[in-house]
Amino acid sequence: MYESIIPFPDETASTVDKYCCSHSTSLPPLFADHAAWTVDKFQTSYMMCCPLQAQMCVFLASDRRARRVLEIGTFTGYSALAWKEGMKAVGGEVWTCEAGPRAIAASKEAFAKYDPEGKIHLVEGPALQTLREINAGPFDIIYVDARKAEYIEYVEIILERHLLAENGIILADDTIHLGLVADRSSTNPHSAREDIEYSLQHADNVYKFNEWAVKHPQLDVLLLPIFNGVTLIKIKSQT
């Protein structure tokens, strides 16, 4: 279908999301339990990826036979658990970094409960510091979901330190940001949000990253209008 980006009203989008989840390989029960716990404990639970996105993470890690995943931004550990699930056949490991004290405490609790094998390694501290110091790579998948103003620096360090494995892939999350990177007019209902100034600041940072990434001579980039925008990045072939 040539006009392939189909907008749904909220009610239809919710129904379509449930349909997609039910027609994708299901997640183990621990994901529903941990999501419910996060919603109960955190007013900012919207920062957690949705079940369908977790299903995507599991699928990608499994399909690519990943053995090492680096996650920039842990929150309560939901997506880290998804990456681990996708690598269970090969015994892969996840390194996930987080700076927020509440998120660190929550993710520690989650990993103690759901990762008794110790396959998930929580790295505490700012993401930029972690990227400059981590020596566990190279990584088959690097998932970026932290401070939008630092996205460019994250990828620069990844390239500089050769943290991405050969044929590895970077996923940058939230790269459409409510559609505000492309449309800030009144036709976008999010342009009337109460927190519009905050949202526009995020959109500005994401816009700069998108422009930088697509023009980078070393990178192949695919920006997809799924979830809140997901950008797939790989290093260009040298042949």
Swiss-Prot record:
Gene3D superfamilies: Vaccinia Virus protein VP39. Coiled coil: none annotated. It catalyses: NK13650 B + S-adenosyl-L-methionine = NK13650 D + S-adenosyl-L-homocysteine + H(+). CDD domains: AdoMet_MTases. Keywords: Methyltransferase, S-adenosyl-L-methionine, Transferase. One of its GO terms (biological process) is methylation. S-adenosyl-L-methionine binds at residues 71, 73-74, 79, 98, 127. Belongs to the class I-like SAM-binding methyltransferase superfamily. Cation-dependent O-methyltransferase family. This is O-methyltransferase ankF.
